[in-house]
Design a protein with these regions (language model features):
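Conserved active-site alpha-helix within GNAT-family acetyltransferase domains
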Residues: 85-98, 205, 229-245
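Conserved N-terminal entry element of GNAT/NAT acetyltransferase domains
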Residues: 2-5, 31-35, 109-129
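N-terminal charged segments
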Residues: 1-72
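A short, well-structured alpha-helix characteristic of acyl/acetyltransferase catalytic modules
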Residues: 129-141
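A conserved beta-strand-loop-helix scaffold within acyl/acetyltransferase catalytic domains
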Residues: 146-195
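Acyl-donor-binding surface of acyltransferase catalytic domains
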Residues: 56-122, 225, 249-251
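A conserved beta-turn-beta hairpin within the catalytic core of GNAT-like acetyltransferases
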Residues: 45-50, 99, 181-190, 199
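Conserved acetyl-CoA-binding loop-helix of GNAT-fold acetyltransferases
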Residues: 59-66, 194, 200-213
């Protein structure tokens, strides 16, 4: 399954293409592709919201990428895949630090979710702009984001019809949140989080399984996500497969 580099790259790029919907209402957003690299920028001063994917060992590629970032005045974090990993030393020479490798995971829709039933005391609702403050509070708690970072993130919250952001509720309190970005017959999972005080209650699993089941029933065939070390156990438990480990570099 997805054993070749070309297959893995195709899925990573499909996930990236789906994420473009986050930026559709940001006037200064940038999407550029070069020979062996791709830049997607939300016009944020925070590099975590601007990303470059490098997938080639081409000579002079890093200098080209650095020049593009300087031209557009964009701070950007970088992911490497396949032959692109050979560019690590060159990027470190430009001040980037390797923060480790993040799992890129996939779930191919199957019948493993068909019998899932949400616990009786829980409900799920698709969120909208009216939920932005509650969502922001959860992101600040889970990801330790500052108000300034969350301010930039708000520009990408529920701005597209393809953005299916869901909240899991217990007694009218949101106890978990996740974004499912629909793209063709695929779904990218982003920004999943459960407030600290509600963790270790299985809420993340309940919400993720509900989303997997719901979007499978809507016709989705492939689901993608980048896992954190903390979240990977949950995704493993829900039947996701690790497709690759992508080095993640940042100056911040």
């Amino acid at each position: 399954m997805y054993t070749s580099f070309e297959e893995r790259l195709s899925l990573v790029k499909k996930c990236s293409e789906g994420s473009l919907a986050f930026y559709q209402k940001i006037p200064g957003a940038v999407h550029l592709e070069g020979n062996g690299w791709e830049l997607i920028s939300s016009d944020s001063r925070f590099a975590m919201f601007n990303g470059i994917l490098i997938h080639s060992a081409r000579k002079d590629l890093v200098d080209e990428v650095i020049a593009v970032l300087a031209k557009h005045d964009i701070p950007s974090d970088i992911r490497l895949i396949g032959p692109g990993i050979s560019q690590l030393n060159a990027l470190e020479g430009h001040g980037y630090k390797n923060l480790g490798s993040n799992p890129f995971m996939v779930w191919s829709a199957d019948n493993s979710v068909d019998n899932f039933q949400l616990q009786d005391h829980l409900t799920v609702r698709r969120l909208d702009q009216n939920d932005i403050r509650t969502a922001a509070d959860i992101y600040m708690d889970v990801y330790r984001m500052s108000e300034d970072v969350v301010k930039d993130m708000k520009r990408m919250f529920c701005v597209s019809q393809n953005d299916h952001t869901y909240g899991l509720f217990k007694d009218n309190e949101m106890v978990s949140i996740v974004t499912a970005m629909v793209y063709r017959d695929s779904v990218g999972i982003w920004s999943m989080g459960t407030p600290t005080k509600h963790q270790k209650n299985g809420y993340g699993r309940e919400l993720l399984m509900h989303v997997m089941q719901s979007h499978k029933n809507m016709g989705a065939k492939e689901f993608f996500l980048y896992a954190s070390s903390a979240g990977k156990f949950l995704y493993d438990k829900c039947g996701w497969l690790t497709l690759d480990y992508l080095p993640y570099l940042s100056k911040s």
